[in-house]
Structures are given as structure tokens and as C-alpha cells.
């Protein structure tokens, strides 16, 4: 017997026939319909969850001045909240990766959303920097769990057809990050607190009786009620989503039936760990360059190129705008192109654009064009990398956590190092050198990764993988039999 996709179907049908010989066709059709419905339901909910994560993560930017004022600190002296959130994300990625392999996926993601909602609800009430940092760490942990679990769950649901869905997942995050500043300014008006004292003063006078020692308290109602509504509305959205994530967990057969995609057997590259380490480095350099350029392009344009602040802000917007737009387009390209092809195209685009940025670092026109191309080139790299490695080796929760830790370390280390070096060499375009260096390294790393991934397996390794696939199929068949 051959234990592949068609083999799995044959085993399941044989079991169903032995149980109810007269009804196997109708039951199989009904089961397939329920499975497809649950798969699409889960995919939609995960996209909504990543949208919420994008809004939750990005709302910190436009509300940062209000949060600093809330804890009586200057903006420049409150940078520890970013470190706290990043460390929380690291911890959440590791813990989530371990837990994702040993507990129900939906239960874990639902609990992480409850944690996010709690952190968002409490954030505007924080009156000390230490407590605010703790809240940011809590939301960071939940982000790490969701990022790790969401990617693995999509691959479990869709298998080899998961590339467009991975792209959609990361587009949802980018869309949320794009919408957050607009919602914060237009809908909630969080930065207008200094100009509108009437309503907050009335609220304070009514609430001061309950918070007489507000200056010494750890938690208190914020002076700016717009800040409260901003975080409360996002927290409510996340809380509602947690209900939809818990729903499949409580569904009778959700724990018993695995998707057909995940029942096709485990894949494992010959040098599985080496491949994960290479992808760890790849994401370290890629994410570091992406965040570094997005964080410093405004200051680089004003100090090095001599742009006006309004022009520099537009340049920053064009980078993130093309980034978000091309993540959306990548959903459709992923249905036509292999993940490896998309990664090659992204590497070529980022290498060419960063090279021209370094070559013509004083040219505003080149800066506009190359920034657009650079943003577009970086957009599909991360989700394509996740889809690509799944073609050669099965991505478990621990594996996903490992490579996401590489991305998180790059996010923290590269911008910090770039800022330090730029301070030491103010006349050099250090930021552009870092981006070019990262582009060169990722372009070199990918062929090495491809070579390692495609090395043929030994006979002993093939037997081990076939045995593992057989166990998965027999386990899946037993569960279907029990469910019936």
C-alpha cells in the first residue's frame, strides 16, 4: 500500500465501508463538505486575526505621545516599551512553537487573543512606565504565539496549496498596520488631546473621587478619553475574534479530524536542521533590512539628501504603501508562481534597488523610485519563504518558532546597530550600506538553501519518513472511525 494523498483516501473509505456499507458515499460527501467549510472558516478567521494583530501593533506609533503623557514621561525616555514588546514576541514565539505541537491549535490561539484583549484594555489605564512596559510585553507574547501558530495552521490546512493563503495572511497584517494610523487620527483623534480639554476635564472631575491619588496610583482612568476608546475598540475586536477561534475547539469533531493536507505524510529534508538554520539567517537579514529602512528612511532623507519633512514623510509612505500593495498582489501571483521563483524575483529586486540607492544616494529622484521598488521587492519575501520551506521539510510549531526568532532578532539588532554606526559616521549613508549588505547576503543564502533542501535522502531516512507517514495515516483513519 502506498501512503500518499490518494492512499489516505482509500484507507479512510475502506474504514467507512466496513462501518456503514450502504451510506459511505453520502457520508464521505458530507464529511468533505464539512471539512472544506471548516477549512475556509478557519482561514478567514486567521486573516481577521492577523488584521487585528497589525492594527494592535501599529497603533502604538500614533498613540505613543499620548501614552508617554499618560505615564508622565518624555517620548525619548520611553523606548523600553518597544524592547519589552520585542522580548515578549521572542518569548511568545518560542512558547507558542512548543505548545502548538502538544495542545489544540484553536484553544491556544483563542487564549492568545484573550491575552491580547486584556493587554489592550489595560494599556490606556497604565500610569507607570514599568506597568506599561509589562502590558506591551504581554501583547508581544500573544503576537508571537499568533504569528507562529497562524503560519503553521495555514500550512496544516492547505498543505502544498498554502502559498496564496500564507500571502493573504501577511497581507492582512500589513493592511492592519496601514489602517492603524488612519483610524487613530481620523476615527479616534488620539493626537488632539492637547487641543480638546473640555470633555476630558469633565470626565476627570467626575472620576477624581475614585482616583484621588492618581499621581501615585498604578492604574487610573486616562486624561484623554480618545486614547481609552482607541485601545478599547481594538481590544473588543480581538475579544470577538477569540470567540470564533474557540468555536472549532468546542465543535464535536474539530479535535478528531485532521485536514487532508496534513494527512499526506511528513516531509523532512536530508539536512533538516541545517536548512532551518539557513532560513533563520535569511530572515534575520531580511527582516532587519526591512525594518531598518522603514524606520530610518525619513531621517536619512532629511539629513543626508536634504528633503523637506513633508517630502520625507511622503517617501516613508511610498515605501510602506508599495510594501502593503504588493503583499496584496502577491496573493494572486502565488497562484501562478512557485514560492522559490517569487523569492528569486524578490531577491533580485531588493538587490538592484538597494544597489542604486547606494550608487545615487544624493539623488531625490532615485530615492523615490528605488524606495518604491525596494518596498515592492521586500513585500512577498517572508511569506514566500514560509511556503518555500514547507515544500521540502514539514514545518512544525518548534521549527516555525525557531525561524521567527531569527526574524525577531534581526528586527531588534539591525536597526539598533545601524543607528549606532550612523551616529559614528554621519556623513556616510550607513542605512543604505546595511540594506545593500543584507540584500547581498540573502541573495547568496537562497541558492545555498535550495541546494541543501534538494539533496537526496538516504535509504534509512526514507524508511524513517515513510514509517512516520504511515503512523499519521493510521492515526487519522482511527480518528475518523471513532468520529463515525
Swiss-Prot record:
GO terms, molecular function: symporter activity
Modified residues (Phosphoserine): 6
Bilayer disposition of the protein: Multi-pass membrane protein
UniProt keyword terms in alphabetical order: Cell membrane, Ion transport, Membrane, Phosphoprotein, Sodium, Sodium transport, Sugar transport, Symport, Transmembrane, Transmembrane helix, Transport
Residues passing through the membrane, by range: 40-60, 80-100, 106-126, 135-155, 168-188, 227-247, 274-294, 317-337, 340-360, 366-386, 401-421, 428-448
Record carries keyword Protease: no
One term under GO cellular component: brush border membrane
Tissue expression: Expressed in brain, liver, lung, and kidney. In kidney expressed in cortex and inner medulla, in ascending thin limbs (ATLs) and lower descending thin limbs (DTLs). Primarily expressed in the proximal tubules of the kidney.
Induction field: After water restriction, up-regulated in inner medulla ascending thin limbs (ATLs) and lower descending thin limbs.
Subcellular location field: Apical cell membrane
A GO biological-process term: D-glucose import across plasma membrane
Domain of life: Eukaryota
Family affiliation: Belongs to the major facilitator superfamily.
Known function: May function as a sodium-dependent glucose transporter. Potential channels for urea in the inner medulla of kidney.
Name of the molecule in the record: Sodium-dependent glucose transporter 1
Amino acid at each position: 500500500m502506498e501512503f500518499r494523498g490518494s492512499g489516505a483516501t482509500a484507507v479512510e473509505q475502506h474504514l467507512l465501508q466496513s462501518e456503514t456499507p450502504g451510506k459511505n458515499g453520502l457520508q464521505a460527501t458530507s464529511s468533505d463538505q464539512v471539512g472544506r467549510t471548516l477549512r475556509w472558516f478557519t482561514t478567514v478567521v486567521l486573516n481577521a486575526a492577523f488584521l487585528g494583530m497589525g492594527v494592535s501593533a501599529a497603533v502604538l506609533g500614533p498613540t505613543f505621545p499620548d501614552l508617554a503623557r499618560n505615564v508622565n514621561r518624555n517620548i525619548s525616555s520611553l523606548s523600553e516599551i518597544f524592547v519589552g514588546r520585542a522580548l515578549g514576541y521572542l518569548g511568545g514565539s518560542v512558547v507558542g512553537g512548543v505548545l502548538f505541537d502538544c495542545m489544540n491549535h484553536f484553544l491556544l490561539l483563542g487564549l492568545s487573543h484573550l491575552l491580547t484583549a486584556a493587554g489592550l484594555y489595560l494599556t490606556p489605564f497604565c500610569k507607570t512606565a514599568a506597568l506599561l512596559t509589562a502590558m506591551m510585553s504581554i501583547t508581544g507574547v500573544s503576537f508571537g504565539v499568533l504569528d507562529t501558530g497562524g503560519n503553521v495552521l495555514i500550512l496544516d490546512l492547505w498543505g502544498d496549496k498554502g502559498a496564496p493563503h500564507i500571502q493573504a495572511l501577511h497581507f492582512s497584517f500589513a493592511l492592519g498596520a496601514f489602517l492603524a494610523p488612519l483610524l487613530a487620527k481620523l476615527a479616534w483623534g488620539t493626537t488632539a488631546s492637547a487641543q480638546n480639554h473640555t470633555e476630558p476635564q469633565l470626565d476627570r472631575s467626575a472620576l477624581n473621587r475614585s482616583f484621588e491619588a492618581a499621581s501615585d496610583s498604578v492604574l487610573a482612568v486616562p486624561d484623554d478619553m480618545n486614547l481609552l476608546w482607541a485601545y478599547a475598540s481594538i481590544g473588543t475586536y480581538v475579544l470577538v475574534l477569540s470567540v470564533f477561534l474557540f468555536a472549532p475547539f468546542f465543535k464535536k469533531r474539530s479535535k478528531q479530524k485532521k485536514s487532508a493536507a496534513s494527512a499526506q505524510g511528513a516531509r523532512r529534508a536530508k539536512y533538516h536542521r541545517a536548512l532551518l538554520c539557513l532560513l533563520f539567517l535569511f530572515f534575520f537579514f531580511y527582516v532587519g533590512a526591512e525594518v531598518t529602512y522603514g524606520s530610518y528612511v525619513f531621517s536619512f532623507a532629511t539629513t543626508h539628501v536634504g528633503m523637506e519633512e513633508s517630502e520625507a514623510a511622503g517617501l516613508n509612505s511610498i515605501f510602506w504603501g508599495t510594501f502593503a500593495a504588493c503583499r496584496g498582489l502577491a496573493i494572486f501571483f502565488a497562484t501562478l508562481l512557485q514560492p522559490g521563483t517569487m523569492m528569486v524575483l524578490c531577491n533580485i529586486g531588493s538587490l538592484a534597488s538597494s544597489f542604486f540607492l547606494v550608487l545615487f544616494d544624493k539623488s531625490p529622484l532615485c530615492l523615490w523610485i528605488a524606495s518604491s521598488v525596494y518596498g515592492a521587492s521586500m513585500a512577498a519575501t517572508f511569506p514566500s519563504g514560509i511556503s518555500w520551506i514547507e515544500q521540502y521539510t514539514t514545518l512544525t510549531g518548534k521549527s516555525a518558532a525557531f525561524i521567527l526568532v531569527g526574524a525577531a532578532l534581526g528586527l531588534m539588532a539591525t536597526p539598533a546597530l545601524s543607528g549606532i554606526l550612523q551616529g559614528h559616521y554621519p556623513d556616510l549613508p550607513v542605512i543604505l550600506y546595511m540594506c545593500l549588505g543584507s540584500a547581498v547576503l540573502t541573495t547568496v543564502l537562497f541558492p545555498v538553501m535550495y541546494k541543501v533542501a534538494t539533496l537526496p535522502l538516504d535509504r534509512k531516512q526514507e524508511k524513517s519518513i515513510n514509517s512516520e507517514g504511515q503512523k499519521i495515516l493510521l492515526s487519522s483513519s482511527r480518528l475518523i472511525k471513532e468520529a463515525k
